[in-house]
Amino acid sequence: AGCARTAPVDQIHSTVSTGHTAEQVKSAILKAGHQRQWIMSEAGPGVIKGRLQARDHSADIRIPYSATSYSINYESSLNLKASDGKIHKNYNRWVHNLDKDIQLNLSAPQ
């Protein structure tokens, strides 16, 4: 049947090292989104929404955050074969890269 192009949707929950403010976490998320070509927007106190367009695909995420943690939650997608809790593997790669950049931004001297 060939290689599976879908995988379970990864829900990312990351802990933030102590000594950060919610504002610094927000800034790290927005910067990481910009670095990875996500369109980020504030969706209320402690919540950022992100959208990534790649050719004819798109993914929408919701990132609740605080001074101590953040999550990257799947909201919706277009042309990413999403069904039954599974999605195209690219989605998981995109959100893991975003998470990695958020962590890097948080580890940089403020």
Predicted feature residues:
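Ser/Thr-rich, low-complexity intrinsically disordered terminal regions
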Residues: 4-110
